[in-house]
């Protein structure tokens, strides 16, 4: 089963918002980890300079990523004070990676990373920024 969430990411040099579809997938790589496929339904990633001017704009529609995190996240309680179905980052806040979340592949279908490693780094940062601190939202995915 999968579920759709909105996401919002904003920091000094980039911002992004849109919709993602999260699907729990069965991988037997490690029994201690849960794997998720993330498909961007819509949204853009903007790269900005220090003045806030947009230097580059990436269409995220149909981009597919794969992540993993320790199953310890299942011990979390469901969100009660956050807007449901939304992944947001907190600007300039250090986020702890409590469940060893990592991005296995930023762009499975090579939609925007075909140009080089810079796009991979930016996507990795985007994914970690919207997921870290929002792990309880993953409890909603059966």
Curated annotation (Swiss-Prot):
Superkingdom of the organism of origin: Bacteria
GO MF: lipid binding
Induction: The toxin locus has divergently transcribed operons maximally expressed during early stationary phase. This is part of the orfX1-orfX2-orfX3 operon. A longer botR-orfX1-orfX2-orfX3 operon is also transcribed at lower levels.
Keyword ATP-binding: no
Keyword list, A-Z: Lipid-binding, Virulence
Lipoprotein listed as a keyword: no
Physiological role: Part of a botulinum neurotoxin type A2 (BoNT) locus; may be part of a progenitor toxin complex required to protect BoNT during its passage through the host gastrointestinal tract. Binds phosphatidylinositol (3,4) bisphosphate, phosphatidylethanolamine and phosphatidylserine.
Self-association and partners: OrfX1 was not detected as part of a crude toxin extract that includes BoNTA2/NTNH, P47, OrfX2 and OrfX3.
Family note: Belongs to the TULIP P47 family.
Protein name in the entry: Protein OrfX1
Organism (species): Clostridium botulinum (strain Kyoto / Type A2)
Gene (UniProt): orfX1
